[in-house]
Amino acid sequence: MEYGALNHVAFTPGKEMLVITDLKSGRLKYYSIDGHYVKSVKLPYWFSRCEFITDNLIAGFWSGGTVIPGENKNYKPLLVVTDLLGNISSSAFQSYYRKEYTSTIFEPIRKFEDRVLYNNPNTDSIFLLTPNGIELAYHLNIKGAKPMIINEDITNDLLREQRRNNPFFNGDFVELKDGAIFHIFESGFPGYRFGIYSNAKQRTFCCDCFRYSPFFCFFDAPKARYGDNTVVVDTRSDIVLAYKDELYKLGKKEEIDEFYKDLTEDS
């Protein structure tokens, strides 16, 4: 069975299956790892992003908020934790979405190993989602930043004004085995800024854009985790080609030449 829209892809907790959030059909489509259709389950609520906390418990996000049966109709949480039958265990973070305010982030819910994490769009806090509730996992105290004020009066124009000359966390982060990395964005700033939190040191190390390793020539916002402590980024092939000589400074010419083998600007 084909899906109508590929809104989000998640693993089941044991990674036996891939699950596509298909808003066009309003269903979760289950596939085996090799791509064979397994089953389809009705979405309990209108979610554009879903991650599995357990086999029967999902965290769902919708930028317009979710109307919860039996609750105040004005309460429309961005985040809902529910079983597949629609029994809600947790919900939080009022949506202010409307014509004047449409800002969000691409991946508000992320999963690393068995930990499901949520970043409320345009804020500096990240929360851990569990069957027992929602708890603070990280709070970013960005040097020189003024906190964003997000309430019922917010508009796209007001948000842009708050972001002007103000560093902010834009939702790009990766949790690693021994820490986490967070992308910090600032309008007009010429370089890439990020913070690395160390579990062992229990402190954050900040990068202010000055690079001492050639790898940072094409380092960008973290997209995913690979293995225990490796961060995956994507960058254009022409940028990778432009910095080949910089990588030679590492002194591993044969390995670098193998890496660049068959790489072209059209790759």
Which functions belong to the PLM regions below?
Residues 73-133:
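Loop-centered beta-sheet repeat module
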Residues 2-8, 12-77, 91-98:
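Asp-box/WD-like beta-propeller blade repeats and closely related beta-sheet repeat scaffolds
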Residues 226-267:
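Blade-level signature of beta-propeller repeat domains, shared across WD40, Kelch, NHL, RCC1
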Residues 2-4, 40-45, 93-101, 139-142, ...:
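Surface loop/turn motifs at the tips and blade-to-blade linkers of beta-strand repeat domains
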Residues 135-166, 199-228, 241:
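Conserved blade-ending motifs and adjacent loop-strand segments that build the rim/top face
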Residues 14-16, 55-56, 113-115, 177-178, ...:
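Short coil/turn segments that connect the beta-strands within blades of beta-propeller domains
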Residues 4-10, 45-55, 99-108, 168-172, ...:
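Repeated scaffold domains used in trafficking and secretory/extracellular systems
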Residues 32-33, 74-86, 192-201, 267:
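Beta-propeller blade signature
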